[in-house]
A protein has these predicted regions:
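Conserved beta-strand hairpin/beta-sheet module of binuclear metal-dependent hydrolase folds
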Residues: 2-57, 155-171
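Short Pro/Gly-enriched beta-strand edge/turn motifs at strand-loop
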Residues: 7-16, 112-115, 137-141
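Short, flexible loop segments at the rims of nucleotide/cofactor-binding pockets, characterized by
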Residues: 13-19, 67-70, 143-146, 177-181
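Short, acidic/turn-prone active-site loops that include or flank metal/cofactor-
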Residues: 19, 95-99, 171-173
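A short catalytic or substrate-binding loop motif that flags glycine-/basic-rich loops and adjacent residues
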Residues: 20-23, 126, 147-150
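Residue-level marker for buried hydrophobic side chains located in beta-strands
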Residues: 37-39, 68, 91, 165-167, ...
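Metallo-beta-lactamase
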Residues: 43-45, 107, 133, 140-225
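Active-site HxH/HxHxD metal-binding segment of metal-dependent hydrolases
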Residues: 45-48, 55-132
Length: 227
């Protein structure tokens, strides 16, 4: 498997299909000074590998006080229960994806696609607006409601010494009526992300994009899903 690595100032990639478990979306670690923040946590089977990857960077998994769930699909949230049980990590997610995360509607998690069971967990901080700001450690995290892939999909950005870093998980889709996907809302969401003019994009499955390649990447999917 590949090794964990720095993406830019304060940001590392610690999980993914070649880093932790084949089913995992990319998992990103943010060094917020006095605490660590995870952006998603994979399907769950690769948790021990993610822990090892965090330690390889000189951090301790116990420092992960908060986990941001970008949406309710199991390849992003399957490990939430274990992280909360082992380390007491708090979970942040949008209220429109709460039903999937908390176990009210398992179809929303897409767990059946992966052939795995999902252990529900309560969300500690429910995001409700179109945009919110929360401070963790010494960093301000900017949350944007970016529905489309799922009703409660969120994107997050932080400003670092290397510029604006955007966590835009699953920009590429896919879409399904079973999850409440909405292409019209997704297109509006993508325009929001382009307008941010981020310097670094950390995507859920496609990896890292920088500079002008970010807008081109998003535009390529806007063209693919024209209607």
């Amino acid at each position: 498997m590949s090794k964990a690595k720095a993406v830019c100032d304060r940001v590392y990639v610690v999980g993914g299909s070649d880093l932790s478990a084949p089913e995992d979306a990319f998992v990103y670690l943010v060094d917020a000074g006095s605490e660590l923040v995870l952006i998603d946590c994979g399907v769950g089977d690769g948790m021990s590998r993610i822990e090892e990857n965090i330690r390889s960077l000189g951090f301790e998994p116990a420092g992960v006080w908060n986990i941001i769930a970008t949406h309710c699909h199991i390849d992003h949230i399957g490990g939430l229960f274990a992280w909360k049980e082992r380390y007491g990590s708090k979970i942040i997610a949008h209220e429109l994806d709460r039903a999937g995360i908390e176990g009210e509607n398992n179809v929303l998690t897409a767990a059946s696609m992966y052939g795995v069971d999902y252990k529900p967990i309560y969300v500690d901080t429910l995001l409700k607006g179109e945009a919110e700001k929360h401070t963790y450690g010494d960093l301000e995290f900017n949350f944007l409601h970016t529905p489309g892939h799922t009703p409660g999909s969120i994107s997050v950005y932080i400003d670092t010494e290397d510029g604006r870093v955007l966590f835009g998980q699953d920009i590429h889709g896919p879409f399904s009526p079973a999850w409440g996907s909405d292409l019209k809302k997704w297109r509006v969401s993508m325009q929001k992300l382009i307008a941010l003019k981020a310097d670094v994009l950390c995507e859920g499955h496609a990896g890292i994009y920088r500079g002008e390649k970010i807008g081109k990447y998003i535009e390529s999917y806007l063209k693919r899903y024209e209607f």
